[in-house]
Structure formats: structure tokens, C-alpha cells
């Protein structure tokens, strides 16, 4: 698979497809609303992510460097997560790796005052959820 194809597939995959399973207390994403046009065409593009427990958050694209990386921020967090997280930033990066592509996903979570004390636990839960999502993404990216 080419870097270009991996970039495009990760950027445009429906979020419920890769985050559709609960991981302990982290609810699955059930839908994305408010997105105008194809996702990933413009820096500043936004969409609202809705989760099965009623939580929601606003995702804003902040970086588009096709085909090497794209980045986003998460804000306007509502629901249970609002107690722990005030915002987050993330970056997906793509680079050739032998005959394939290395896909990396990094993030930085800004905790609330209350959430600061819970971050070690939240970090373990989030890492598990992220690993689960990467497994789902791996299935999609298989040639």
C-alpha cells in the first residue's frame, strides 16, 4: 500500500468503524454530525463526534500535509468525559516502511483540574481504546 492511499483511507474512514467498540468506560463513537463536505479537505473543518453514552465533542482539523500527516483538536467536550478532559490534540503521520507504510498516531490530552489526578488511570484506558482502534484500522489497511 502506498503512503498516499494509507493517508486517504485513515483520513476518511468513518469514525464509528474504528471506534465502534466500548473499551471499559470509554464509550464507542456512534455517529459524526455537522460535517460539511468530504472530511480532510480544509484546515478549520469541523464535525461533532457523538458517543453511545450521550457524550459529544467537537473535532477541528488543524493540519493537512498530504500525504504525510494530518492533525486535529478536540474541544467542547460534553458528557462524562467533560469531568476529566478539557481538550486534546492529535496527529496522524504516514511514512514508507519497507514495502508498506508506517502509520503513527500521537495525542496530547489536556485534563481538567479534577481530571489531572485521574490521568494515570485515564491514560491506561485511553491507550487500550487507541490500541483497539489501531487494530480495526489495520484490518482496513490490509491490501
Model-derived features: positions:
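Hydrophobic ligand-binding cavity/cleft-lining segments
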Residues: 1-39
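Short, highly charged C-terminal tails/helix-capping segments
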Residues: 27, 31, 135-143
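A short, structured loop/turn motif at beta-sheet edges
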Residues: 1-4, 62-69, 93-104, 139-143
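Short beta-strand segments that buttress and anchor functional surface loops
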Residues: 44-52, 72-79
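A generic structural signal for short beta-strands and their flanking turns/coil linkers
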Residues: 43-45, 55-57, 66-70, 88-90
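Beta-strand/loop substructures that line and gate deep hydrophobic ligand-binding cavities in soluble
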Residues: 74-128
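Short acidic/polar mixed-charge low-complexity motifs
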Residues: 53-55, 99
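Short hydrophobic/aromatic-rich beta-strand segments that constitute the beta-sheet cores
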Residues: 49, 59, 69-74, 103-105
Amino acid at each position: 500500500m502506498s503512503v498516499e492511499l494509507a493517508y486517504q483511507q485513515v483520513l476518511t474512514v468513518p469514525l464509528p468503524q474504528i471506534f465502534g467498540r466500548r473499551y471499559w468506560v470509554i464509550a464507542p463513537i456512534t455517529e459524526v454530525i455537522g460535517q460539511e463536505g468530504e472530511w480532510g479537505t480544509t484546515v478549520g473543518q469541523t464535525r461533532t463526534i457523538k458517543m453511545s453514552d450521550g457524550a459529544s465533542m467537537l473535532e477541528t482539523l488543524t493540519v493537512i500535509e498530504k500525504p504525510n500527516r494530518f492533525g486535529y483538536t478536540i474541544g467542547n467536550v460534553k458528557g462524562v468525559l467533560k469531568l476529566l478532559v478539557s481538550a486534546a490534540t492529535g496527529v496522524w503521520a504516514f511514512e514508507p516502511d519497507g514495502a508498506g507504510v508506517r502509520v503513527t498516531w500521537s495525542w496530547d490530552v489536556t485534563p481538567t483540574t479534577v481530571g489531572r489526578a485521574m490521568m494515570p488511570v485515564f491514560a491506561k484506558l485511553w491507550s487500550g481504546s487507541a490500541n483497539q482502534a489501531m487494530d480495526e484500522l489495520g484490518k482496513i489497511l490490509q491490501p
